Regions:
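C-terminal catalytic "cap/lid" subdomain
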Residues: 1-161
Length: 161
């Protein structure tokens, strides 16, 4: 959904004409390829990385913040995850605000298909100068304020630490 300040036209579809939130990116359709010598198309497995897509949109739109919302309340410390499950308690969240380097150090320890893409996108966003938040949908405003969830923030000097 792209909210524009006037009726859509070829002149008004740039990010500069947006007056509301941009919500897009995701799956759908069946990707296909033409194999050498074949006259038909074959379906291939492909998944849209919605976190990387969100980061790309944030970068293209010049966003100052990116929220990666999920059913988890924050980016949890992967070293505490299993222990917390055995002890039936909430795992410890990664201290917030976190630097891109702190989050990148956790990437190999995070589950591949769930939190790792969010953490990777958040770290890259911060390296690009965009504040990134990870947490639950109902906490979106508090994540931006830094009172809930995990914020990954650009470090001074632009290197992203």
């Amino acid at each position: 959904l792209l909210a524009l300040d006037s009726a859509p036209s070829s002149q008004s579809s740039s990010p500069d004409s947006c007056v509301g939130p941009v919500i897009c990116g995701g799956g759908g359709g069946v990707p296909v390829v033409a194999r050498g010598g074949s006259t038909g198309l074959d379906a291939v497995d492909a998944v849209i990385d919605k976190d990387a897509t969100s980061l790309l949109l944030a970068s293209l739109l010049g966003a100052s913040a990116l929220l990666l919302l999920t059913d988890a309340e924050a980016l949890y410390d992967p070293g505490d995850w299993e222990a917390s499950r055995r002890e039936e308690r909430r795992p410890e969240a990664v201290p917030s605000p976190a630097s891109p380097g702190e989050v990148e150090a956790l990437l190999p320890l995070l589950p591949e298909g769930s939190m790792r893409p969010k953490a990777a996108a958040a770290a890259r966003a911060a390296r690009e100068g965009i504040v990134a938040g990870i947490g639950s949908l109902q906490d979106a405003a508090e994540i931006l304020m830094g009172t809930k969830g995990t914020l990954v923030v650009p470090t001074r000097g632009g290197g992203g630490g």
